[in-house]
Design a protein with these regions (language model features):
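Short beta-strand elements at the ligand-binding edges of bilobed clamshell
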Residues: 159-161, 168-190, 231, 301-313
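Extracellular/periplasmic periplasmic-binding protein-like sensory domains
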Residues: 256, 268-340, 354
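Bacterial Sec signal peptide processing site at the extreme N-terminus
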Residues: 20-45
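Beta-alpha junction/loop-to-helix N-cap segments that form part of ligand/metal-binding clefts
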Residues: 85-86, 101-168, 267
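N-terminal secretory signal peptides
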Residues: 1-23
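An alpha-beta-alpha
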Residues: 176-233, 329
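Periplasmic-binding protein-like
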Residues: 129-141, 161-163, 201-204, 254-266, ...
Length: 407
């Protein structure tokens, strides 16, 4: 995906503040899975954002002897810095959990550093962390910042676990802890296979993020034993009727019995056109994306009744809501569980107390780890995998039809 991939993830990592931080976010923001969208062009990491002064951490918390850096945007773009502060709060909450539990060793001290909203800021913060002597870097948040900080960390031989949702920025020693497009698609196509569906197809927007989803769909469908029936792309919603007209003969011949429509901006339109064409959910299972999870209007649309979509199990976020509100006020954003999980992971005895700490073979343990969002695994190529649940839109609301017990 190259630069395009970095761009969709950079803009994408901003959109979810509308639901979680609605009072402080621009009205145009809407919650999507773990991803965010603001009109912010270019891949240069922030268009004029000032590099923060990185001579000293903004804050330190924890009482352990192993130094770990947490790089987050705490200045610059208002929405991004608000999210960054919320993730810092979630990390503090995790440290508080460690300190309050006598059965958990206090192994780490977190040094919180500001990346601002630019790649240059991430480079500066990472360099300062290296000079400080940290053994692990958590963050930063956006794809181009992970790339920038990752270059510094890799040169210093320090592993980095970033929070971008774009797997193209991952690599040996630079991990991304987030729900990636391939993770969503793998969970969704395996569920279809388990349900006896045999002819998956997909409709994707001609955008960098849409291209990432389409590529993941093809790869994961083949890996699950499918031969994808068709992959359609569109540049404008005005093309929707033409795509349905092309798909209808394949549906009638039984070649398409499941249809991915992950783009929440167009999903209801495609579902409505299918219904007008006489296609029922019994004939074709509609499948969305984790981006649907917090779009209340979309989930109430009758045209999407019966549709399924992969999602992060909400139990983890619900488990920290009360403590977060009591300590910091307000509700934690969906991404709070990522920072919380990363902090707990950094404190794990077998990782932090190893010699040397955080070796690649330890971080990529095939058994994976149990995080706030359920099971997850890091791979040698830097990508991650999550055990997602499957949700279904029912007449009485959203129900979980398959759990995330395995990856």
């Amino acid at each position: 995906m190259g630069g395009k991939g970095a761009d969709w993830s950079r803009r994408a990592i901003l959109a979810g503040l509308a639901s979680a931080l609605a009072a402080c976010s621009p009205g145009s923001l809407q919650w999507g899975s773990r991803s965010f969208s603001l009109p912010w062009g270019g891949d240069n990491g922030g268009g004029g954002g000032l590099s923060p002064i990185a001579s000293a951490p903004k804050e330190r918390f924890g009482r352990g002897r192993v130094n770990v850096a947490l790089l987050l945007p705490l200045s610059g773009n208002a929405a991004l810095s608000q999210l960054g502060q919320s993730l810092a709060n979630a990390s503090k909450l995790a440290i508080g959990f460690i300190e309050a539990n006598p059965n958990i060793g206090e192994n780490i001290t977190i040094s919180l550093r500001d990346t601002g909203d630019s790649a240059a800021g991430a480079t500066s913060a990472a360099n300062a962390a290296v000079v400080e002597g940290v053994k692990l870097i958590l963050g930063p948040l956006t794809a181009e910042q992970v790339t920038a900080a990752g270059n510094v960390a890799r040169a210093a031989g320090i592993p980095l676990i970033g929070f971008a949702n774009n797997g193209s920025v991952a690599g040996p020693g630079v991990y991304v802890l987030n729900v990636l497009p391939e993770t969503e698609m793998k969970r969704a196509v395996r569920y279809l296979r388990d349900q006896g569906r045999r002819g998956p197809a997909g409709i994707f927007p001609a955008t960098p993020y849409g291209e990432a989803l389409a590529t993941a769909f093809r790869q994961q469908a083949i890996a699950a034993g499918f031969n994808p029936s068709a992959v359609y792309t569109f540049s404008s919603i005005s093309e929707a009727q033409q795509i349905i007209d092309q798909a209808k003969p394949l549906i009638e011949r039984g070649m398409i019995d499941a249809l991915f429509i992950p783009d929440r901006a167009s999903a209801a339109t495609f579902a409505g056109l299918l219904a007008q064409a006489g296609v029922t959910n019994e004939t074709v299972q509609l499948v969305g994306s984790a981006d649907w999870a917090h779009d209340a209007g979309l989930l109430r649309n009758p045209a999407l009744a019966g549709a399924t979509f992969p999602a992060v199990d909400e139990a983890g976020l619900n488990a920290i809501r009360a403590d977060y509100a009591a300590r910091f006020g307000g509700n934690p954003p969906q991404m709070a569980t990522i920072a919380y999980t990363a902090t707990i992971l950094a404190n794990v005895n077998t990782l932090s107390l190893a010699t040397p700490p955080y070796e690649a073979n330890l971080l990529t343990n095939p058994a994976g780890f149990a995080g706030r969002d359920g099971l997850f695994r890091l791979y040698a190529d830097g990508r991650s995998d999550y055990a997602l649940v499957i949700k279904q839109i029912g007449t009485g609301g959203i129900v979980t039809t398959a759990d995330g017990a395995r990856i």
